Each structure stands twice: as C-alpha cells, then as structure tokens.
C-alpha cells in the first residue's frame, strides 16, 4: 500500500526476524528499509558493506542470543540497504544517475525524516561504515553514536583502486560471476573462513556466496562506483565529537585504515577493538567478540541487557545522560583491546 509520503510498505514476515519492509523514495532513488521492533524505542540504523544487505551482513550478530538481547531489547532496528541491494531487487535502469557517496549519506537523512526519527545510533560495516560516518559529519545533531566495523575513511589506495577496477570490469562484462564472488569473499572474511585445499570453506562463507548469487551485477557496480570515488574524510574526523566504537579484524584488508581512523578521532570519544583471526566482517565471522565492548559502550547511554536492567527504553536518548567518566578511553573498552578470540577449524 502506498501512503502520502510516497513509500510502499510490504509485509515480509518470512524475512529476517519478521521485520517489515518500507520502500522510501529519496532524491537519489528508492531505498529499502527493513524495520524490526518497537518503533517507540530509540533507533539503531544499520548499513552493510558492498554487495551485501542486512541478511548477509548483520544476520550473524542479530542471531547471536546475547547480542540480540542487548540490541533488540534497547532499540528498534532500521536496516537500510544500498540501492538495489535488498532481497529480490531488480536491476536498476542503466540510464539512472549513479549516486555518489555523499548522495547515499543524504539518503540516510531522508530515511530518518520519513520515519520521524530524531537522533539515532548507527552501525555500519566497511563501505556502510563510511556512509554512516559521512552522514554523522554532515548531520552531527542526528547521530547519537557510531558502531563501525572495519571502517573506511581515506580515499582508495592504489591497491584498493586496482582491486576495485578489476571487479568493476568483471561486473560490467560478466555480472556476479564466480571470480567476483571470490574477490568479495576475500574482502569480507579471514583465510580460515574462506578455506583452502586442506580446509573446506566454512558454512559462513558458503551462505554468503549463496546470498551473493542473488545480487544484480549492475546494482553492485553502482555502489562500488560510489565507494571508489569517495573522498578522504580524515580531516573532518578530528572535529567529529561523536562517541565511536570501532571493530577491526586483524586479517582485514582495511586494518591499517581502521587504525588510522581510530588515531584521528578524539581519544576521549573513540575506542578501537581488534579481533584476532578475523576478517573485515566481524558481525558474521565473530559476532561474540562484539558483545562485551558493545555492552560497555551502551552503558554510557544507560542501556543494558534485559538480565541486568528490566525496563524497556521508551524515550529518545540524549548525550546529556553521559557522565564525563564514561567518555574516557578506559570506560569505552580500551582495556579490552585486543579481543583474544580464535576460530577453530571446521
């Protein structure tokens, strides 16, 4: 059914946690948003990495019972998909203009306004982390905090530019072929998860490969083009007074970029958690490693797991509830760095 705001709401009870899909029209195209939970609760916005959506990027985290109890008890979840990355998406018309990273960040504001949201918590992975960070820099008053997984903040390096160019050509001529999926799995996961001649590919990688089969090559190409043209936002990070929790796998190709971002942000507002034996997508590969740092991080907003605090939050969160002590690096989890976790061979 179409409403007066120009969005179509579709019941998708069989899709991820029984959420509801809203298709929100923005200046840069239609955006799919899966909403799950009580909309009177504070909002948690998620944004996935290249070629992924909420099913392939955040399912592991939200299916982790401890993390789910922490996040779903305290937030209403708004899973935003990059244009054309939602489940069952058709190919985007080639004549449609290709959005820039800034256009995608502006879409976030339009989504928030459509749902009538004020300040929100944001969680993004790699390319999605860049989009949400850019949004926070442009609209600081709308962002309560950032939870970033393997984030980007600089313009592409020569090696990343070359890597992206190879994928671009493959997508253009062959679509989501096997070679493209192999490149993407290298982007997402550690060697242990991807497997080799001696170690079989893990269930996580196999599931991701199947979900990548559903992506339209032209749609992935458009998002890749936006990310490949991204500007360096490092200088703006120094002015971003926003509490930020960064996770990075020690086998991620973006490890040095995440460390650079953490070093650039104000130490009083940022904590970096390194996860051992893990690639970029910590949300899928080692979601349990995120639990304790997130608990410490959210305690600064008076949010707890149900076993610790039974009341359900109903009012918008405000940074004013944060005591100065909770803005110290120690209170934000730096004592937990690095997280010593290992993956056992399947």
Swiss-Prot record:
Chloroplast is among the record's keywords: no
GO CC annotations, alphabetized: cytoplasm
Disruption phenotype: Slight reduction in length of primary root.
Tissue/organ expression: Expressed in root vasculature, cotyledons, leaves, petals, mature stamens and pollen grains.
Pfam families the record matches: Ndr
Keyword Cytoplasm: yes
Subcellular location: Cytoplasm
Swiss-Prot/TrEMBL induction comment: Induced by sucrose and glucose. Down-regulated by auxin.
Main location: cytoplasm
Keywords for this protein: Cytoplasm, Growth regulation
Gene Ontology biological process terms from the UniProt entry: auxin transport; regulation of auxin polar transport; response to auxin; response to jasmonic acid; response to salicylic acid
Family listed: Belongs to the NDRG family.
Quaternary state and interactors: Interacts with GB1. Interacts with the heterodimers formed by GB1 and GG1, or GB1 and GG2. Interacts with RGS1.
Described function: Interacts with the heterotrimeric G protein beta subunit GB1 and plays an significant role in GB1-dependent regulation of lateral root formation. Involved in a signaling pathway that modulates root auxin transport and auxin gradients. Acts partially by positively regulating the auxin carrier PIN2 and AUX1. Acts, together with GB1 as positive regulator of meristem initiation and branching.
The protein's name in its UniProt record: Protein NDL1
Organism this protein belongs to: Arabidopsis thaliana
């Amino acid at each position: 059914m179409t409403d007066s705001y120009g969005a179509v709401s579709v019941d998708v009870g069989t899709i991820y946690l029984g959420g509801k899909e809203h298709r929100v029209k923005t200046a840069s195209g239609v955006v799919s948003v899966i909403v799950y939970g009580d909309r009177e609760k504070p909002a948690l916005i998620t944004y996935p990495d290249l070629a992924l959506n909420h099913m392939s990027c955040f399912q592991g985290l939200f299916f982790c019972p401890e993390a789910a109890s922490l996040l779903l008890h305290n937030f209403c979840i708004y899973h935003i998909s990059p244009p054309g990355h939602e489940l069952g998406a058709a190919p985007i018309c080639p004549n449609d203009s290709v959005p820039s990273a800034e256009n995608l960040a502006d879409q976030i504001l339009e989504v928030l306004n459509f749902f009538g949201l004020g300040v929100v918590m944001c969680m993004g992975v790699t390319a999605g982390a860049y989009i949400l960070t850019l949004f926070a820099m442009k609209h600081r008053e709308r962002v309560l905090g950032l939870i970033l997984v393997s984030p980007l903040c600089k313009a592409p390096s020569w090696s990343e530019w070359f890597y992206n160019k190879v994928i671009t050509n493959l997508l253009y001529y062959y679509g989501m072929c096997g070679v493209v999926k192999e490149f993407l799995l290298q982007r997402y996961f550690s060697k242990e998860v991807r497997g080799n001649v001696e170690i079989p590919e893990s269930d996580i990688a196999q599931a991701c490969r199947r979900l990548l089969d559903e992506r339209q090559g032209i749609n992935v190409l458009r998002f890749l083009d936006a990310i490949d043209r991204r500007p360096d936002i490092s200088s703006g990070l120094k002015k971003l007074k926003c509490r930020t929790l960064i996770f990075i796998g020690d086998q991620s190709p973006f490890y040095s970029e995440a460390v650079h971002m953490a070093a650039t942000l104000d130490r009083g507002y940022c904590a970096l958690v390194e996860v051992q034996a893990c690639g970029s997508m910590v949300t899928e590969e080692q979601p349990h490693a995120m639990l304790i740092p997130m608990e410490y991080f959210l305690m600064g907003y008076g949010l707890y797991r149900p076993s610790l605090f039974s009341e359900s939050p109903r009012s918008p969160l405000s940074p004013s509830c944060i005591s100065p002590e909770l803005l110290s690096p120690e209170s934000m989890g730096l004592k937990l760095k690095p997280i010593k976790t290992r993956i056992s061979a399947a």
